Amino acid sequence: LKCNQLIPPFWKTCPKGKNLCYKMTMRAAPMVPVKRGCIDVCPKSSLLIKYMCCNTNKCN
């Protein structure tokens, strides 16, 4: 997940209301993204799942 280093034309712009980019990974396999997309509030990470969030609405 890249927040501020956008690589055109592959970046994603999140819609209003869900304007944070996020990526979810399993802590056991941190290099394998499970899910990524847009969300309104960054979820808290748990023992098994780690969330990375951008504070912008554009990300790669």
Curated annotation (Swiss-Prot):
An individual GO BP term: killing of cells of another organism
Keywords: Cardiotoxin, Cytolysis, Disulfide bond, Membrane, Secreted, Target cell membrane, Target membrane, Toxin
A GO MF label: toxin activity
SUPFAM superfamilies in UniProt: Snake toxin-like
One family name in Pfam for this protein: Toxin_cobra-type
Compartments, record wording: Secreted; Target cell membrane
UniProt key word Disulfide bond: yes
Disulfide pattern: C3-C21, C14-C38, C42-C53, C54-C59
One annotated Gene Ontology cellular component of this protein: extracellular region
Tissue: Expressed by the venom gland.
Main location: secreted
InterPro entries: Cytotoxin_Cobra, Snake_3FTx, Snake_toxin-like_sf, Snake_toxin_con_site, Toxin_cobra-type
Protein purpose: Shows cytolytic activity on many different cells by forming pore in lipid membranes. In vivo, increases heart rate or kills the animal by cardiac arrest. In addition, it binds to heparin with high affinity, interacts with Kv channel-interacting protein 1 (KCNIP1) in a calcium-independent manner, and binds to integrin alpha-V/beta-3 (ITGAV/ITGB3) with moderate affinity.
Record-stated family: Belongs to the three-finger toxin family. Short-chain subfamily. Type IA cytotoxin sub-subfamily.
Subunit composition and interactions: Monomer in solution; Homodimer and oligomer in the presence of negatively charged lipids forming a pore with a size ranging between 20 and 30 Angstroms.
Protein name from the UniProt record: Cytotoxin 1
Organism the protein comes from: Naja mossambica
Classification of source organism: Eukaryota, Metazoa, Chordata, Craniata, Vertebrata
